[in-house]
Amino acid sequence: MWVGVISLFPEMFRSVTDFGVTSQAIKKGLLSIETWNPRDFTQDKHRTVDDRPYGGGPGMLMMVQPLRDAITAAREAAPGKTKVIYLSPQGRTLNQAGVEELATNENLVLICGRYEGVDERIIQSEVDEEWSIGDFVLTGGELPAMTLIDSVSRFVPGVLGDFASAEEDSFADGLLDCPHYTRPEVLDGKEVPSVLKSGNHKDIARWRMKQSLGRTWLRRPELLGNLALTDEQELLLAEFVREEHQQSK
């Protein structure tokens, strides 16, 4: 996967390129990230990238010319057909389904806004999709872009050592993940559930599904309304709820 990033602060993306799974993916040639700074495309000695909005109001907007030229440069550098994304509070909220959808693209250009945003005509003429990471305000689009890169790259074949890791993550099947345990077997008097030490893979899978359903019911019940549970899942959830009520008495 190739990702081009348009940002006034390209140095921020070193946290993606130099560390963790994404860094390893870059070293393996599975992921490529390039950055373009609109300041490098300005036409004045002050390298101006912002201007006042028509109609007045607080703040400034990113100027059209430097931003458009940066987008053009990124498009031309892309190895193939490219989808251009603007990280925006007005965009579609990113979730696991959206991540998997975006992961089907081989090339992405991500535009990171600053100030009060960008000229609407840039969105109309240059942007294919707008995406948001939530209903809250950030100072720029860099953190959302890094979030998108991190989440999408997990679905690039070979990026994760075990692709099942991505398939079993929280939200991969619409549910929260189940609890996980490692050594020591007993910690502060709390033991690892015996089923996980049994070696019975069928029982372990059943326990994990039950815990996943139960955790979703406890913490994000609205997610269950979007799922068509199997008969077995319905039974496991009912069993979890019953046990939870018994423990709370």
From Swiss-Prot:
Family membership noted in the UniProt record: Belongs to the RNA methyltransferase TrmD family.
Keywords annotated in UniProt: Cytoplasm, Methyltransferase, S-adenosyl-L-methionine, Transferase, tRNA processing
Query: By its UniProt entry, which Gene3D superfamilies does this protein fall under?
Result: 3.40.1280.10, tRNA(m1g37)methyltransferase, domain 2 (1.10.1270.20)
| Quaternary structure note | Homodimer.
Q: Which CDD domains match?
A: TrmD-like
Q: What does this protein do?
A: Specifically methylates guanosine-37 in various tRNAs.
What name does this protein carry?
Answer: tRNA (guanine-N(1)-)-methyltransferase
For this record, the Gene Ontology CC terms, alphabetical, are: cytosol
Q: Name the chemical reaction catalysed here.
A: guanosine(37) in tRNA + S-adenosyl-L-methionine = N(1)-methylguanosine(37) in tRNA + S-adenosyl-L-homocysteine + H(+)
Superkingdom, natural source: Bacteria
Q: Write down a Pfam family by its short name.
A: tRNA_m1G_MT
Localization (cell): Cytoplasm
Which Gene Ontology terms describe the biological processes this protein takes part in? tRNA N1-guanine methylation
Q: Name the residues that bind S-adenosyl-L-methionine.
A: G113, I133, G134, D135, F136, V137, L138
Do you know which InterPro entries this protein is assigned to?
Alpha/beta_knot_MTases, tRNA_m1G_MeTrfase_C_sf, tRNA_m1G_MeTrfase_TrmD, tRNA_m1G_MTases_N, tRNA_MeTrfase_TRMD/TRM10
Offer an example of a GO molecular function term for this protein.
Answer: tRNA (guanine(37)-N1)-methyltransferase activity
